[in-house]
């Protein structure tokens, strides 16, 4: 049956109109433009490997059935040439001749096949006179008629086109395919490193009745079934800690988080996160684990810990990594000592002199210290660096430092000037945790939409007893940024983009 005319057909671009007419012509002649299947016998990559030994002009009697997207077409008289490309980018030439397929099939090839079509070709494996491995066709079929033309293959796609039409990007750009493979290899390496150390992977809720586990603005939705407001999770932390309470002493999750905040070269509202917790650990042991995770991921995905970035420079992730402390490093940068006892008003004055916009009502001492530190130091941390010992006010889920009053056992890992991961010695005292939650609730009541609410069920879990624990969260997209030098939208296969 031939489809009826499209009511909007008059408005489509000319090339789409022509291709649609070819599709209709194939169907009207009793052919198939989109068959259920075709008898493919080999991938193009398999053929290239198996017949790499053929000399120029050598022919075989081996018959194969191959498929691929047409990325080059040339036809002269009784012979037509095409280059097919399969999903991984492997290409192979096919030759369609009148002697091989017959006059009608050759004419149909010339009239119906366009760049971008996916075709099936059956024939003998040969090497052309120029030494090009080829399939000399004895038959062909359309496997999927493309109604839209491909972009010009030798021209660079704009970033806008790449992120909005990743499917086109994957067809035409080897770098896009490489990025997807690298991401898969990195995630596999993270899982293997953790599983080899006895960690168990779990899944925790994406929809939550309270938002917690990080300081961020949540996405809000509503459940019709429960007639209640729900939040897309900003972090899985509080549920993974429940697992530790329940006896899963080494636990991790790789999944999506959502934060209703800005989007730029290092931030995406939807992003992938690895979060892991280890009972009987602390922020030192979890830091060692984090270094192993990153280094193993580099080796798995790129074969080396000295990775080559998109701009051609090299970045060394090997060996031991530097550690600095927040208060001493900020003091050295400012030329005056900053401690947990430094008055908030003094910090406000420093920030204003440096041109930092300050919320004088809601920003605590800790928030001011972190903002000053980021303004003065963060961008300068090119080599992998653990920044340790944060203000207590900004880290409500972290254990107080065992020696230093006013700070907590937390580090942020900076790589190439941006934050890659965060690690804690976890707060396991439910009484202190409740006090921290109460302070967060006070900030929320003052209008801080990133502050956490009191999670009574989590506190109930902690009241059953939670062992000393180290925890870490690391952005998968940012890890790819660190390993490749790309922006975050290039490391996410289908990033969120503003609707047109």
From Swiss-Prot:
InterPro entries: Aa-tRNA-synt_II, aa-tRNA-synth_II, aa-tRNA-synth_II/BPL/LPL, Lys-tRNA-ligase_II, Lys-tRNA-ligase_II_N, Lys-tRNA-synth_II_C, NA-bd_OB-fold, NA-bd_OB_tRNA. Keywords: Aminoacyl-tRNA synthetase, ATP-binding, Cytoplasm, Ligase, Magnesium, Metal-binding, Nucleotide-binding, Protein biosynthesis. Pfam families: tRNA-synt_2 (PF00152), tRNA_anti-codon (PF01336). The keyword Metal-binding applies. Homodimer. NCBIfam families: lysS_bact (TIGR00499), PRK00484.1 (NF001756). This is Lysine--tRNA ligase. It comes from Kineococcus radiotolerans (strain ATCC BAA-149 / DSM 14245 / SRS30216).
